[in-house]
């Protein structure tokens, strides 16, 4: 009798059912005929299924484009009251508009969080972030040049703000 695993495999269709013959009861044909090699038929050519045109998963994004160096027509000044105002800053900076951020109406924790966001934004879009006063920052795109000197007191203020 076959083992239970073999029976289960046959039941599930994972193996062919083999008849268990005792050695003395084998069919006469198998004893008389010599083993012959059966020629393997050539594989039939498979028809190529028509494929549908491929559509890209990701649409071309305008967020990675660099702002075109154009004539500067405006500078945006933002007085954020909460972190959610960062979206306005990001949208305008992405368009190539320099943004002045006045943090005087924000708490220190929210101001730090917004400056961290603005720093990442400026680095990601190859811009620059500069401190103008203790709570005012300038985000300038890569095509905008800002000139001026940084005094010793401004350097101390910058160190005290970021050194917390």
UniProtKB/Swiss-Prot annotation:
One of its GO terms (cellular component) is cytoplasm. The keyword Chloroplast does not apply. Its main location: cytoplasm. InterPro entries: Cell_div_SepF, Cell_div_SepF/SepF-rel, SepF-like_sf. GO terms for biological process: division septum assembly; FtsZ-dependent cytokinesis. Residues 22-54 have a biased composition (Low complexity). It is found in: Cytoplasm. Keywords: Cell cycle, Cell division, Cytoplasm, Septation. It comes from the Bacteria. Residues 21-71 are annotated as: Disordered. Belongs to the SepF family. HAMAP family: SepF. Homodimer. Interacts with FtsZ. Cell division protein that is part of the divisome complex and is recruited early to the Z-ring. Probably stimulates Z-ring formation, perhaps through the cross-linking of FtsZ protofilaments. Its function overlaps with FtsA. This is Cell division protein SepF. It comes from Clavibacter michiganensis subsp. michiganensis (strain NCPPB 382). The lineage of its organism: Bacteria, Bacillati, Actinomycetota, Actinomycetes, Micrococcales. The gene is sepF.
């Amino acid at each position: 009798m076959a083992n239970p695993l073999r029976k289960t495999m046959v039941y599930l269709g994972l193996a062919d059912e083999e008849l268990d013959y005792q050695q003395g009861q084998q069919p006469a044909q198998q004893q008389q005929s010599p083993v012959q090699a059966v020629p393997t038929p050539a594989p039939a050519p498979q028809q190529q299924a028509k494929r549908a045109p491929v559509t890209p998963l990701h649409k071309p994004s305008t967020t990675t484009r660099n702002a075109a160096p154009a004539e500067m027509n405006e500078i945006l000044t933002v007085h954020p009251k909460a972190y959610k105002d960062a979206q306005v800053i990001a949208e305008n900076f992405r368009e190539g508009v320099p943004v002045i951020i006045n943090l005087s109406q924000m708490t220190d924790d929210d101001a730090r969080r917004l400056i961290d966001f603005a720093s990442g934004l400026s680095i990601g879009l190859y811009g620059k972030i500069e401190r103008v006063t203790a709570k005012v920052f300038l985000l300038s795109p890569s095509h905008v040049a800002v000139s001026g000197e940084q005094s010793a007191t401004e350097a101390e203020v910058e160190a005290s703000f970021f050194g917390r």
